[in-house]
């Protein structure tokens, strides 16, 4: 696991625990987003996500962490000029109408600066994943997406 992940993982673990255990926290994450009306009270797809992500073998990191785009030119979700290749975490929610939302979570440490094009790349990558999940065997099918950024006030 990269050094950054090991530093961020305790925070991401806490976020994941909240998302997996509390509808209130899931609702809080999507409140104020375009997904709010459709996904309030949605179920979390823990077992489905784990099964898809670990279908070949269990990885070192948690099943919800570090969704990589790929470093080669074949990655259609790479953003021109940006060095960002991954989403720190993705959580999948199913609405009462059986639609699925991918909640892409990005984490920045206090006083950590954004790289060139990094904040702009988050929603573009999430949108790309929603259009290309059928070619990504470890990404759950989903209809909609949002990005959520956890960071210090100084980062904004």
Regions found by a protein language model. Give the residues of each.
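Charged, terminal alpha-helix-loop-beta segments
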Residues: 1-156
């Amino acid at each position: 696991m990269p050094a950054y992940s090991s530093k961020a993982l305790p925070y991401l673990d806490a976020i994941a625990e909240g998302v997996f255990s509390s509808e209130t926290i899931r609702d809080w994450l999507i409140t104020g987003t375009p997904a709010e009306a459709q996904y309030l009270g949605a179920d979390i797809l823990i077992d489905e996500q784990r099964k898809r992500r670990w279908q070949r073998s269990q990885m070192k990191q948690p099943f919800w962490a570090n969704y990589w785009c790929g470093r080669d030119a074949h990655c259609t979700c790479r953003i021109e000029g940006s060095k960002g290749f991954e989403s720190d975490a993705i959580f999948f929610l199913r609405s009462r109408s059986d639609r699925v939302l991918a909640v892409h979570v990005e984490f920045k440490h206090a006083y950590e600066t954004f790289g060139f094009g990094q904040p702009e790349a988050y929603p573009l990558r999430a949108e790309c994943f929603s259009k290309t999940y059928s070619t990504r065997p470890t990404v759950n099918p989903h209809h909609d997406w949002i990005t959520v950024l956890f960071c210090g006030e100084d980062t904004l």
